[in-house]
């Protein structure tokens, strides 16, 4: 971290801007909004500065830079079009241990100005450390679209309720649960935006009187196939609100880096034929932590209801009366095929797609006759160890030996690797691939050479 982000209290504190042009005006607006007692020193001033001075909002000092103006200052900004003057301002401020921003010269400055999203009292600052202001601006614009304009009113109202919340709810867990309900209450937010005091009071009293659930809850979240960008917004919200996250081997490090920092993490790594923690024990972990009143997120690769054993875990919770919900994820079949340039359906080649487990319960058997039918795509999950059997069975039940196949290893990640061939090579190809991997069988695989976009990036 090259810079420490801080928020300065400048109300009624002396600040200096050196410069009287458009850039200086933009900086002055920010300092005035923050309540600073502002002095502006320049040879000439654009008209806006004169307007502000006539309204008593700031003091103008016309003439060359006078470093004695820094003597009482808390903060300074050099915003002239003369690099020599800006350097003098920076050095004079440095000798007085005053933080100084030098416009367009981050290396000469002791602090930089971020892009700001103002939802006072909520403030969001975005900075690229001075290396790419345009990138910081683009990120700010994206965040602006995500944060409702009335969010500041909600935050300000929350501040008025803090003492009451502290008095009514004894533990930190209870207070956090109250605030989580408070901030996601759309009726309250709309009432505040409409200045409907009666509705605000009614909603507030309802929130305080509504009993907090001490049983805890479990949220089953699909993390997607690997690329953190494929995690859903709702999935992101859940992992950032969790008390504890129970996750498996298929959840990428990039996604785990998005988990709330003070949340507990329990690794229960699983892969075909090997369980770091047996499924029954995982079920009991979820149950035990929820019974402690915690918000538990069970984070699974792909989609939890597609070969993720999510249904089994929820049955345990249902039997115990533990509240639960499910956030779907992009399943591996969809993600891996898209990132490999293989459409799962196509008018000319496949009118249906089948998602098939290659890891069966003891004694299990697939409907090979229907799986070998034409005009469909097969996607085998956990099929590496059974690749030779899949090859032999499909051929035995009539699938053409030259049917295209692809194996996608570490799909959607920067480590993605795809090997492809024909059905008679499937068992051999599987020896070249490591888990996690997906097997795709069908004529659509032949489109990969034309549609493969990801490996070209």
Swiss-Prot record:
<feature type="modified residue" description="Phosphoserine">
    <location>
        <position position="128"/>
    </location>
</feature>
<dbReference type="Pfam" id="PF00590">
    <property type="entry name" value="TP_methylase"/>
</dbReference>
<keyword id="KW-0627">Porphyrin biosynthesis</keyword>
<dbReference type="GO" id="GO:0043115">
    <property type="term" value="F:precorrin-2 dehydrogenase activity"/>
</dbReference>
<dbReference type="InterPro" id="IPR006367">
    <property type="entry name" value="Sirohaem_synthase_N"/>
</dbReference>
<comment type="function">
    <text>Then it catalyzes the NAD-dependent ring dehydrogenation of precorrin-2 to yield sirohydrochlorin. Finally, it catalyzes the ferrochelation of sirohydrochlorin to yield siroheme.</text>
</comment>
<keyword id="KW-0808">Transferase</keyword>
<feature type="binding site">
    <location>
        <position position="411"/>
    </location>
    <ligand>
        <name>S-adenosyl-L-methionine</name>
    </ligand>
</feature>
<dbReference type="InterPro" id="IPR019478">
    <property type="entry name" value="Sirohaem_synthase_dimer_dom"/>
</dbReference>
<comment type="pathway">
    <text>Cofactor biosynthesis; adenosylcobalamin biosynthesis; precorrin-2 from uroporphyrinogen III: step 1/1.</text>
</comment>
<comment type="pathway">
    <text>Cofactor biosynthesis; adenosylcobalamin biosynthesis; sirohydrochlorin from precorrin-2: step 1/1.</text>
</comment>
<dbReference type="GO" id="GO:0051266">
    <property type="term" value="F:sirohydrochlorin ferrochelatase activity"/>
</dbReference>
<keyword id="KW-0489">Methyltransferase</keyword>
<feature type="binding site">
    <location>
        <position position="306"/>
    </location>
    <ligand>
        <name>S-adenosyl-L-methionine</name>
    </ligand>
</feature>
<comment type="similarity">
    <text>In the N-terminal section; belongs to the precorrin-2 dehydrogenase / sirohydrochlorin ferrochelatase family.</text>
</comment>
<keyword id="KW-0597">Phosphoprotein</keyword>
<keyword id="KW-0560">Oxidoreductase</keyword>
<dbReference type="GO" id="GO:0019354">
    <property type="term" value="P:siroheme biosynthetic process"/>
</dbReference>
<keyword id="KW-0949">S-adenosyl-L-methionine</keyword>
<protein>
    <recommendedName>
        <fullName>Siroheme synthase</fullName>
        <ecNumber>2.1.1.107</ecNumber>
        <ecNumber>1.3.1.76</ecNumber>
        <ecNumber>4.99.1.4</ecNumber>
    </recommendedName>
</protein>
<feature type="binding site">
    <location>
        <begin position="331"/>
        <end position="332"/>
    </location>
    <ligand>
        <name>S-adenosyl-L-methionine</name>
    </ligand>
</feature>
<dbReference type="InterPro" id="IPR006366">
    <property type="entry name" value="CobA/CysG_C"/>
</dbReference>
<feature type="active site" description="Proton acceptor">
    <location>
        <position position="248"/>
    </location>
</feature>
<keyword id="KW-0511">Multifunctional enzyme</keyword>
<dbReference type="GO" id="GO:0032259">
    <property type="term" value="P:methylation"/>
</dbReference>
<keyword id="KW-0520">NAD</keyword>
<dbReference type="InterPro" id="IPR014777">
    <property type="entry name" value="4pyrrole_Mease_sub1"/>
</dbReference>
<feature type="binding site">
    <location>
        <begin position="43"/>
        <end position="44"/>
    </location>
    <ligand>
        <name>NAD(+)</name>
    </ligand>
</feature>
<feature type="binding site">
    <location>
        <position position="225"/>
    </location>
    <ligand>
        <name>S-adenosyl-L-methionine</name>
    </ligand>
</feature>
<keyword id="KW-0456">Lyase</keyword>
<feature type="region of interest" description="Uroporphyrinogen-III C-methyltransferase">
    <location>
        <begin position="216"/>
        <end position="457"/>
    </location>
</feature>
<dbReference type="GO" id="GO:0004851">
    <property type="term" value="F:uroporphyrin-III C-methyltransferase activity"/>
</dbReference>
<dbReference type="InterPro" id="IPR035996">
    <property type="entry name" value="4pyrrol_Methylase_sf"/>
</dbReference>
<feature type="binding site">
    <location>
        <begin position="22"/>
        <end position="23"/>
    </location>
    <ligand>
        <name>NAD(+)</name>
    </ligand>
</feature>
<dbReference type="GO" id="GO:0009236">
    <property type="term" value="P:cobalamin biosynthetic process"/>
</dbReference>
<feature type="binding site">
    <location>
        <position position="382"/>
    </location>
    <ligand>
        <name>S-adenosyl-L-methionine</name>
    </ligand>
</feature>
<dbReference type="InterPro" id="IPR028281">
    <property type="entry name" value="Sirohaem_synthase_central"/>
</dbReference>
<dbReference type="InterPro" id="IPR000878">
    <property type="entry name" value="4pyrrol_Mease"/>
</dbReference>
<dbReference type="InterPro" id="IPR037115">
    <property type="entry name" value="Sirohaem_synt_dimer_dom_sf"/>
</dbReference>
<dbReference type="InterPro" id="IPR014776">
    <property type="entry name" value="4pyrrole_Mease_sub2"/>
</dbReference>
<dbReference type="Pfam" id="PF14824">
    <property type="entry name" value="Sirohm_synth_M"/>
</dbReference>
<feature type="binding site">
    <location>
        <begin position="301"/>
        <end position="303"/>
    </location>
    <ligand>
        <name>S-adenosyl-L-methionine</name>
    </ligand>
</feature>
